[in-house]
C-alpha cells in the first residue's frame, strides 16, 4: 500500500460545474481571518465546546499567515456522513497554510453542533477557481492535481489513533484562490 492509499486519498470529479463554483464564490462575502489554535490536552468526542475550548490556546504568532474563511452550508452530508463544518477559504497573494495535521478540537463534532459526539473522518476540499498562481495542495508531500469542481478527499481523523494526513497549501503568488473545505464525521 502506498502512502496515499494509507490516507484514503481520492478524487471525485464534477461535484460542481464551473458556473456553480462561481456562484458559491459570489454568495460568500463575509470573510474573517482564521483563528489559529493549538490543543493543550487530549480531546474527546464527548467533551462539550466549553471543555474543548479550555483544552486549547490561541496562537498569537504574527508570523503565521491567517487565511480568510467564510462559513457555508453548501454541503451538509457527504457519502452518508454528516458534515458539521463547511467553509469557503480565500487565499490572497501571500496567503498559505503550512504542512500540518488538523488539531483535535476542530475534528470533534461537539465544537460545531452540541451533543453529536462524533469525530472527523475525512477532510474534503473542492477548488472553486483556477485563475491564480501558486496555491498548490500537498498531501503527505505529494502535489495533488486540482481541477475546479472536483472533490479531493483524504483522512483527517479526530481520533489520534486513526489516519491523519499531513496537508497544506503553498503560497498564492498571483490572484485569489478559493476552495470549499469540509469535514465528514462518524461515531
Listing of model-derived features with the role each one plays in the protein:
Residues 88-92, 106-133, 180-184:
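Short, conserved beta-strand element in jelly-roll/cupin
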Residues 1-87, 91-96:
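Non-heme Fe(II)/2-oxoglutarate
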Residues 96-104:
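Histidine-centered catalytic micro-motifs
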Residues 1, 79, 114-115, 143, ...:
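Beta-strand elements of modular eukaryotic interaction domains
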Residues 80, 118-120, 161, 176:
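Residue-level preference for beta-strand/loop junctions
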Residues 16, 28, 103, 128, ...:
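Short beta-strand segments enriched in hydrophobic/aromatic residues
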Residues 131-187:
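Catalytic core of Fe(II)/2-oxoglutarate
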Residues 84, 95, 120-122, 165:
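Short beta-strand or tight-loop elements
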Amino acid at each position: 500500500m502506498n502512502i496515499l492509499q494509507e490516507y484514503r486519498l481520492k478524487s471525485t470529479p464534477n461535484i460542481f460545474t464551473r458556473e456553480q463554483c462561481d456562484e458559491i464564490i459570489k454568495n460568500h462575502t463575509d470573510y474573517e481571518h482564521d483563528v489559529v489554535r493549538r490543543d493543550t490536552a487530549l480531546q474527546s468526542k464527548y467533551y462539550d465546546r466549553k471543555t474543548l475550548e479550555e483544552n486549547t490556546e490561541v496562537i498569537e504568532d504574527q508570523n503565521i499567515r491567517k487565511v480568510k474563511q467564510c462559513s457555508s452550508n453548501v454541503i451538509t452530508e457527504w457519502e452518508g456522513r454528516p458534515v458539521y463544518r463547511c467553509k469557503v477559504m480565500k487565499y490572497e497573494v501571500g496567503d498559505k497554510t503550512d504542512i500540518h495535521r488538523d488539531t483535535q478540537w476542530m475534528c470533534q463534532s461537539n465544537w460545531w453542533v452540541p451533543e453529536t459526539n462524533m469525530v472527523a473522518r475525512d477532510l474534503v476540499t473542492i477548488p472553486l477557481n483556477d485563475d491564480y498562481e501558486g496555491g498548490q495542495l500537498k498531501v503527505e508531500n505529494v502535489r495533488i492535481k486540482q481541477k475546479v469542481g472536483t472533490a479531493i478527499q483524504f483522512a483527517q481523523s479526530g481520533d489520534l489513533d486513526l489516519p491523519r494526513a499531513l496537508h497544506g497549501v503553498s503560497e498564492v503568488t498571483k490572484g485569489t484562490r478559493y476552495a470549499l473545505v469540509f469535514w465528514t464525521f462518524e461515531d
